[in-house]
């Protein structure tokens, strides 16, 4: 199975976690003073250094040379990236883009004096993230040696000037340690004489100055955390990275030794939230910029970030009134109280039950002590492979039962319970709901608890078939209000429910903009001819002069533009409907709040101006991907962002469905216009991929629209996977081409690596075969199967194990089947089995055989060969039958093909499928052959009618009950008498089990020979008759073909004679 490619931030965080543990993270390495510009990565082409997380990511690669560049930049410099070198990914954000300026009246491009289109810069409301791959100078041949920058300044003087210009209060000698005290806004340092050098003193002073920048009057970071806390460690991480950057810039070095105590907290923070390092690196850059600004002759006044007032939402008490606390049974409440103690780190009081014992008694299973509160409900099926049964997700199969699982804090899952029967899903969801209530009551924080109650209520309303749309909307709004209040009061919950917009906001600095004079009234919207424009055709209508109406979320033909070219997109009755609605609404002053959500006034707010607009009352619409005037908006201040006042705007956001469809296409999935895909319902779906045969669906995806739309895609043909999250824009052609190229490269690399492994294994098997000997006396396996000794099969020196070589159609040996004395079978590791087989009698004998007779295993093939008196083929398993049949049919196209299949009737009863029969029939159909199956004596391979029937469901219940009773007998679980009695009722009786066991012993032609009352004579009669009929049919077919060919030749001769006359 292909490894899932992790998001960029998780890859970066995981590498840094490993380096933190080893003490080798970039900011953990000490640097000597006097070497400026030697450590922070830079791009020699642009002359600029990499910043933020990109600098951390590149430094973490461990190269001594700080120079990094793209492949193209290296080539442009006359250098060449060495073959086989692996690049390092970085990311950057695009906050503006160029657009062609169009005439507002005609919609045509505006040209300059040279006839070229005039370009205008548009600030993006939804910044876009891009990725690039860079290589270190040590990976590139042909670059000149690194020239170290000579330090032409006094690092001490620069540092002293910065400290003096900052105006910070610095006190010496009061303490033996260095620290910044937020309450007095002062830096405290030991006496200068206590430092080993001046560089060390100034490096320490600048580190504390980094903390000083976090004061509310400066960069306003959260400094209200006690020494040793997680919040304190996060602030230290920011100051430490900033010190590293400043140390490289000034040349005063960097000494991280005194901050080793924070390593554990840093690791924990990155494990819980990989994005923390991104935020820390961004804040470190702000610290560095703020500090270095004091070097300039004219110190610019630093503006403080505007405080964001809490939204006017429901109070805590109002929320609890809106969403009633769900009822909880006394026993469940006791579990919640115990769980709360565990989460707080306390042990249960003496005499009280442990959490495991309490949950086992009350719920029937143990809840893990590190349970996160999350529960997963999953549809499952049981499958059997190589004699072993296992539970797997149902996927697109009919679920056999539903499982409930609890999430561990470390990310794993623990099975809790299974449910079968017609109400299985309902019962599983009811248990999940019960556990959600327990988790909510176990939550100590009242705001987070209220949010959990609201989620439970929303889920119950969603599942209730009697709920109306109004009920669902009200429940959703109550949940959002509760989560919003919790977010404002709880830092940890804020981190966990932060979505992609916050992720973007943390990575970019806000830009302040001057406010425009207030307007008395918003201009009335002119009459507009609205259009029905598919997303893919938006560029076409835009080029013709159409504009986007954010409030109606539709394209329209502006006044003065000829409507004729837009005829195919005309929306009948749409314009009239909009006008009628507008006339029916009373005119209101612009400063008043809109009446309802559907009457929102949308705005065109560039990303850099979002904080100013937010302070004026703008709010973000996640669905429309646009800002709008909130309920308490000051329309006078928002006037400047009304769409009509912003001539150049970013194109409307692509809908999640269209964006997900584009992602599917980029992954090689087939999405047809007007087709059913994608289905964004949160369920699993199969989809056709490029290169699939008719009926195949090698693609798989899950997509949902709840909250922040997201999904997962996998192309099983290429092995490439994608975790998708809506961004509001589609991939451009270059990005699509890059993704497709990466998929093709991965597919080729996988195929190349697999071929290499197969070849190496084939050579290893060849060497191993030299120590084996041909079989002269039957091995234990051959004796057990009643088989004669046939040439080509090998054994060890003791004659105990059986070795069966497997070849391809060209005669090359790729693998070997090893059979132990007890019949256990396995193949060589990393070997090729598909399309490989063993010929009983050898390839020369097969060439002389009248037909290609192919069986699943060696025992079947050898039994049939002894009955027919000519060579047969063993394909080793049912899944390999078709590949072997196609390979041999291509080599011997004139020979008829007979598939001697297994009849797995006991599997049909217990699992609902008969893999032996199905695979044999598919193989025969693929080559125009015939599938034959053994016919046993009455009662040998049939389930007795007098016994109670067995279905896949009650067989699964039997296995579950058998396991639970075995666990109870071993002391692993405790069962009540009622539970024990109920489980025993689910067990199959002895007669049923004996019948299944007997059927399992009668499936193939070797069983017919050795275990059936019909014996070898039965095999001979059946296979000779079946193969003889196939040969007879083939002979007749060939005779008919010959006659047809003779007729054709005679007609051609008559035509030639006629032309002669």
UniProtKB/Swiss-Prot annotation:
State any GO CC term. DNA-directed RNA polymerase complex
- What are the EC numbers? 2.7.7.-
Q: Does the keyword Mitochondrion apply?
A: no
A GO BP entry is:
DNA replication
Q: Where is this region: Disordered?
A: 1034-1061
InterPro entries listed in its UniProt record: ArdC_N (IPR013610), DUF5710 (IPR043764), MPTase-PolyVal (IPR041459), TOPRIM_DnaG/twinkle (IPR034154), TOPRIM_dom (IPR006171)
Keywords annotated in UniProt: DNA replication, DNA-directed RNA polymerase, Nucleotidyltransferase, Plasmid, Transcription, Transferase
Gene Ontology MF terms: nucleotidyltransferase activity; single-stranded DNA binding
Toprim domain mapped to chain residues: 850-938
Q: Tell me, what does this protein do in biology?
A: Required for autonomous replication in E.coli. Transferred into the recipient cell during bacterial conjugation. Catalyzes the synthesis of short oligoribonucleotide primers with CpA or pCpA at their 5'-termini on a single-stranded template DNA.
Protein name in UniProt: DNA primase TraC
